[in-house]
Amino acid sequence: KLIVAAIKAVFPRHNILSEECGFIDKRSEYTWIIDPLDGTSNFASGIPWFGVLITIFKDNLPVMAGAYLPVQDEMYFAEKGKGAFKNGEIISIPEDKELKDSLFAFCVDYTEDQDFINRGLETYKSIVRQSRNIRSTNSLVDFLYVAEGKFGGVLNLFTKVWDISGLGLIISEAGGVMKNINGNDIHFSISKDLMDENFPVIAGNKKIVEQILVINS
């Protein structure tokens, strides 16, 4: 509520979309996408992998994103065409890093679609065999660690627009790529319906993302 109130006070004509407040449509070309607590289960369990994520869209494209990890006091920021930063220092993804040398984050949540789960688990087993090791915070931290080169990549089968639109921008500005699990670019269409859409995504450097797409095919 504090974040939404602050945006309304300074940018009263901008749209706002979040899981908590829904879609506030002002017919603006600018939309703020807010995730006030990404990693809710971690937070509730006393695990320090959670944070705040805010993304600004112009029309249907993310143009600016900020992510803050309060326990670590780490701020990540990216602006379209201007790079990605952590606490003011530029970050980048090693373009030559391979899956076999990388920690890889894999995330899957509960769904009643058992076939989807089974396919995901088959992919997981292949990644275990071909990567250095598996790590997962099941939060924005997985993607931020990819952006600064700690993780080689991430596959998350259940995300919403407030989870990954800004993280995709941060990863892109750090020199990486984010695709859906079919290998296509991810497109957003700002509307209330966007809140219900699931985005299974893969992110990392181009080489690792292509390798995961082959594994998942």
What does each model-found stretch correspond to?
Residues 92-217:
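An extended, acidic
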Residues 19-20, 35-38, 42, 142, ...:
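Acidic active-site catalytic centers that drive phospho-/nucleotidyl reactions
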Residues 77, 84-87, 106, 153:
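Short hydrophobic/aromatic-rich beta-strand segments that constitute the beta-sheet cores
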Residues 1-37, 177, 185-186, 206-217:
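N-terminal subdomain of lithium-sensitive/metallo-dependent phosphomonoesterases centered on the IMPase/IPPase/PAP
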